[in-house]
Regions:
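C-terminal compact regulatory domains
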Residues: 1-134
Length: 134
């Protein structure tokens, strides 16, 4: 399995997913890698968190594409219009329809990567490590 470098303290990922099971699954993977995890169950909660003081802690956002209300694309577009760290934080789309997803549309919205569900541990850790610059 892929292991993060020695300098992995204070690493933090925000998981945005309306499905409790999916959030817990990814959270367990990341916590096994000594990564702090923040959770949001919808787009508005994610935006609220990214506008709070806790935003400074967040290195990467894992964004579910299909959520009730605001989907992942819409949420990302709003995040990218905000000031401060929100504009820069890497956002990785998570989707069960990996092969049908338009990568160009994700990039245009401001997303930095795509991970298919079910989540592969090594792929997840590699993507996060690369985008966070750890």
């Amino acid at each position: 399995s892929v292991k993060l470098g020695e300098n992995r303290m204070d690493k933090c990922v925000l998981i945005v997913d309306d499905n409790d099971f999916n959030r817990e699954l990814v959270k367990d993977i990341l916590e096994d890698e000594d990564i702090t995890v923040y959770e949001a169950e919808d787009g508005s909660s994610a935006i609220e968190l990214l506008e709070s003081e806790q935003a400074d802690d967040i290195d990467v956002v894992l964004m579910d594409m299909r959520m009730p209300g605001m989907d992942g694309i819409e949420t990302t577009k709003i995040i990218r219009t905000k000031n401060g760290k929100c504009m820069e934080v890497p956002i990785i789309a998570m989707t069960a329809d990996g092969f049908e997803t338009d990568i160009g549309m994700l990039q245009k919205a401001g997303m930095n990567g795509l991970i298919s569900k079910p989540v592969d541990v090594n792929t997840l850790v590699e993507h996060i490590t690369k985008l966070a610059g750890w």
